Each structure stands twice: as structure tokens, then as C-alpha cells.
Swiss-Prot record:
GO terms for cellular component: cytosol; nucleus; tRNA methyltransferase complex. Required for the formation of N(7)-methylguanine at position 46 (m7G46) in tRNA. In the complex, it is required to stabilize and induce conformational changes of the catalytic subunit. InterPro entries: Trm82, WD40/YVTN_repeat-like_dom_sf, WD40_repeat_dom_sf. Pathway: tRNA modification; N(7)-methylguanine-tRNA biosynthesis. Forms a heterodimer with the catalytic subunit trm8. Residues 40-117 are annotated as: Disordered. Its main location: nucleus. Residues 52-64 have a biased composition (Basic and acidic residues). WD repeats lie at residues 116-158, 260-301, 306-346. This is tRNA (guanine-N(7)-)-methyltransferase non-catalytic subunit trm82.
Length: 517
């Protein structure tokens, strides 16, 4: 049985290098010959370690307090007069049993401590100058900026990490490569510098913090109205707890709120048209919003309205900057003139998915499969001057190839069947002397067309990266040597295999239930 590693959930081409994220690690390869270069590993967040330690200490203290209390009392309200203390009779036998149970609970909890693991990578992007890789580790809500090492191995090193107020779900980089634009699932879009600078709070900010200092808490009860020793202790603890000064929990780095949606954001793009910059955002409420670029991002230029279900992916072909292609939970791919907000065409994607599944599934199963677009990608064939659009859907072992015609229609030309569900796509550098290549990462852990059923342990395991070269206006599968990590990270056990669903398949969860509509 071969060793199984976590599949690659994100792929990006960075010049002559392939940047591939699997779990909480990023592998880098030479895209020309497939040679392995290095692996960057996400660190275990310190905040998670501290919170876990504090939680365990608190739990231990509570257990100790509960075990010490053998004669429970009724805690009196401060306004009530003293009442008789009623002691509950506890037999010797029952007391011994209780102690045994409590001791066994402690042993059980202490015998299986939770192991802290680094947060998986949920988003990945590259700056236009190819100098930096920006990754989002979702569990700790951190944006990490990585730079290339000036060594032969061309490894990545982290130069900054910034924890956002909410979990980022999509990233974009401005054309000057100086600003990161981050969208989170609570509908907010922030800008922050690519390379952070020390942020010194101003005197005005310090004054405002002093003005917001909380007043001292004065409980209505006092030592004159509380008589029992236990209630006096509770009163003192209440005073100490209530008089604690609340600490500032906001980010301590330079950042700015640009705009906000009232719904969960799903994707973001930065576009430039006629010398003016725009920010395009998509959300769960079927909206595509066109806003002006920084510093006027609060001004809404237009909306692209027409989707019935959520919008999950946006794509603007660099060769056709006025055109937007969007997809999500609808059966169709939409083509827009995004600045005018006008819908140019719709192309059915579900029919292609159903045609693929006909051989493997019954008609009822194929009909019940809903579209959840996970990727819309663009490539340019310089030989035929064709704009190529590639679309993938969640839980579908295929990639669907379209031509974007001069009349702004998407024409289906090919379906690439894959040995596993498609996860991410990227291209090698197009070279006029040789055809460019398409690289697709697949899920080789689950059965094709399924997001829950694991493959049999004795079944053959496909390569997590599939390669295709473009010849005569068609993609042809090719065998590519290399592209194999050499570290020991990412090897999966049975429990980790079951936990992959949440990382690899999260677009379909955006679909609203009947009671949400």
C-alpha cells in the first residue's frame, strides 16, 4: 500500500516555479523539470497554544473546586435575609463512589491530551512581480507573506503574519504589488500593506482609550447584607472579576476597512479599465458588486445581478479586461460586461456534468447533483488567438474547457475526465516554441464523484497532480516525472482522511436551505 499524503488544495504558478499548498504546508517545484525544491510549514499559532493551556488550567481548577465541595449550600441573593443552612446527607459509600468517578474522569481527560496542529492553508495568491507568496491559514485567521529565499533550493520564508478580525476567505493584490486586499466571510473588505510597517498609536488614540475606561463596579450587596462566609467570598470574587479593565483586542497593525457587504463574501478581484481601478466582490446573496478602487472603495459603481444562487468564483480574462465570467450554485456560467452590469450570455454547465456522470450514475443520482463552481480559469493560446476558459465544480472528476468567442459566448470544446475530483488548476508559462501546459490537482483520497466515501485501502492511488499539454486546440494528457515532495509532512492517517472534507469541499455549503430564503 502506497503512502497517502494530503491532496493539493491550492495551486499557483510563480514564474518558473509551481507553488502547491497541501494541508498546512506549501511545496515548491521547478515547473520545467518537476524537481522538488522545498517545503514551507505553517507554524502552530501561539494564541492557540495559550488559549488551550488557559482552558485546561481553568478546567482543572473547576474540577478541584467541585471535588472539594462535599456539603453543597444554597447561595443566597444579596437582597434576601439569611436562611437556614441545609446540609444534604451523603452516605460514606456514595461519597467513596463519587470520588472514584471524579478520579476516573480526571484520568480519562489527562490520558488523551489534544495535539495542537498548524492551521491549514485556505487561500493562496502571488504578487504580479512574482516576488511574494501570500497565504491564509484559516483556523487562526492569519495572512502570511512569504518571500523567496536567495538560495539554490529557492525555498520560502515568512516575513510577516497578521491576524485579521475575521477569517479571510479571498485575497487580491493591487497592480503595484504594495497592498493586500482581504475579504472575510462576515462581508468586510480590508486593505493592508504587503510589507508591514511599525504602527505607533497617536496621542488622540491614547486619549480615546483613556476616556473609554470602564467605571468601577459597585454591587448592590455588601458585607452588611451578606452573612455566610461562602457568600462573602463570592461577593469578593464578583468585585474582583467585574473591576478588571478590558484589554484592546483589535489588530495592532496598519489596516483599513474599505467596504462591506451584508452577506458572506466568497470571492474578490482587482481590475483596471481605462486607467481606473475597481474592486469586484461576490457574495452568498447572488450579488456581484462593482466598487471603485482605493481610496474610493466606498463608492459603488454598479451591480451584476442575475444569479439565482450564490456566486462563488469570478474571472476576468487579462486579454479581455471588460469581460467578467462568474459561476456558483447556478446551473450556468455567466458572462458580463461588468462595468455596465449587463449580462452578455449564459452557458449551461450542468448538462456537461450530467453527460460525464451518465456512465457512472443513475439518472436520479445525476439529476440530484447540484453545481458548485470551485474554479474559473483563463488561458490564452497565442497560436490560434483563442481565449480558453476552464471551469471546475465541487465533487466532479473533470475539468470543462470552453472558448470565449468574439461575440462573448462560451462554447464548450472539451471535457477532461480525471481520476479524482478536481481541486485546483494552474498553467505553466506559455512558450511560443512549445505548447503550454495545464496542471490540475485532484483528490486521490476519496472516490471520484464523492466527497465523503474514502477509497479502498487496496485500490490504486492516482498522482495528485495531473498534467495536460495543449496541441491543435485540444488538451492532451501527458505523464510528467517529478513533482513529488521529499519531506515527511502531510502523510495521512485514517482520522485525518475523514477530516479532509471540511478543507477540500466547502463551496456547496454556501447553498441556502429553504428556511433561509
Amino acid at each position: 500500500m502506497s503512502i497517502l499524503r494530503s491532496p493539493y488544495q491550492c495551486l499557483k504558478q510563480c514564474g518558473n516555479y509551481l507553488v502547491a499548498a497541501r494541508g498546512s504546508s506549501i511545496d515548491t517545484f521547478d515547473i520545467k523539470n518537476g524537481s522538488y525544491l522545498s517545503t514551507w510549514k505553517s507554524p502552530v499559532p501561539e494564541s492557540m497554544s495559550r488559549s488551550k493551556t488557559t482552558e485546561e488550567e481553568t478546567q482543572t481548577k473547576n474540577e478541584d473546586q467541585n471535588s472539594e465541595t462535599a456539603t453543597p449550600e444554597f447561595i443566597l441573593e444579596s437582597s434576601a435575609p439569611p436562611a437556614k443552612r441545609r446540609k444534604l446527607s451523603i452516605t460514606k459509600e456514595s461519597g467513596e463512589n463519587t470520588g472514584v468517578v471524579q478520579q476516573s474522569k480526571k484520568k480519562t481527560k489527562n490520558s488523551s491530551p489534544k495535539i495542537l496542529e498548524p492551521s491549514p492553508i485556505t487561500a493562496l495568491t502571488i504578487t504580479r512581480d512574482l516576488q511574494h507568496v501570500i497565504a491564509v491559514t484559516g483556523e487562526d485567521k492569519t495572512i502570511r507573506v512569504l518571500a523567496w529565499e536567495d538560495t539554490v533550493e529557492k525555498g520560502l520564508r515568512q516575513i510577516s503574519d497578521r491576524t485579521m478580525p475575521k477569517r479571510p476567505c479571498a485575497l487580491a493584490i493591487t497592480d503595484d504589488c504594495n497592498t493586500i486586499i482581504s475579504a472575510d466571510k462576515f462581508g468586510d473588505v480590508y486593505s493592508l500593506p504587503l510589507i508591514p510597517s511599525p504602527l505607533v498609536p497617536s496621542a488622540t488614540e491614547n486619549a480615546s482609550v483613556q476616556k473609554q475606561a470602564p467605571k468601577m463596579f459597585q454591587p448592590s450587596a455588601s458585607a452588611l447584607t451578606v452573612h455566610s462566609a461562602r457568600n462573602l467570598k463570592a461577593l469578593e470574587a464578583q468585585k474582583k472579576q467585574s473591576n478588571k479593565v478590558s484589554e484592546k483586542t483589535g489588530p495592532d497593525f496598519e489596516h483599513k476597512l474599505l467596504l462591506g457587504h451584508v452577506s458572506m463574501l466568497t470571492d474578490i478581484l482587482v481590475a483596471t479599465l481605462s486607467g481606473r481601478q475597481y474592486i469586484l466582490t461576490a457574495d452568498r446573496d447572488e450579488h456581484i458588486r462593482i466598487s471603485r478602487g482605493i481610496p474610493q472603495a466606498h463608492i459603488i459603481e454598479n451591480f451584476c445581478l442575475g444569479h439565482i444562487e450564490y456566486v462563488s468564483r469570478l474571472c476576468i480574462p487579462p486579454t479581455r479586461p471588460e469581460i467578467l465570467i462568474s459561476g456558483g450554485g447556478d446551473d450556468d456560467l455567466y458572462t458580463w460586461n461588468w462595468l455596465n452590469g449587463s449580462l452578455l450570455s449564459k452557458t449551461n454547465l450542468k448538462s456537461q456534468v450530467e453527460a460525464l456522470d451518465t456512465e457512472k450514475q443513475s439518472a436520479q443520482e445525476a439529476e440530484s447533483k447540484k453545481i458548485a463552481v470551485t474554479g474559473v480559469y483563463h488561458a490564452r493560446d497565442e497560436v490560434s488567438n483563442q481565449d480558453i476558459i476552464i471551469a471546475t465544480s465541487e465533487g466532479v472528476p473533470a475539468a470543462f474547457i470552453y472558448f470565449l468567442t468574439a461575440s462573448n459566448q462560451l462554447t464548450h470544446t472539451q471535457t477532461l475526465a480525471l481520476p479524482g475530483n478536481a481541486l485546483s488548476c494552474t498553467f505553466s508559462n506559455p512558450d511560443l516554441s512549445s505548447p503550454f501546459s495545464l496542471i490540475i490537482s485532484i483528490n486521490n483520497i476519496h472516490e471520484p464523484s464523492s466527497i465523503t466515501t474514502l477509497k479502498d485501502a487496496n485500490s490504486s492511488v492516482a498522482n495528485p497532480l495531473q498534467f495536460f499539454k495543449y496541441e491543435n486546440e485540444k488538451f492532451v494528457s501527458v505523464q510528467q516525472d517529478g513533482f513529488a515532495p521529499q519531506d515527511s509532512e502531510g502523510i495521512l492517517d485514517d482520522q485525518q482522511k475523514n477530516n479532509l472534507c471540511g478543507l477540500l469541499y466547502n463551496v456547496g455549503n454556501l447553498r441556502k436551505m429553504e428556511d433561509e430564503e
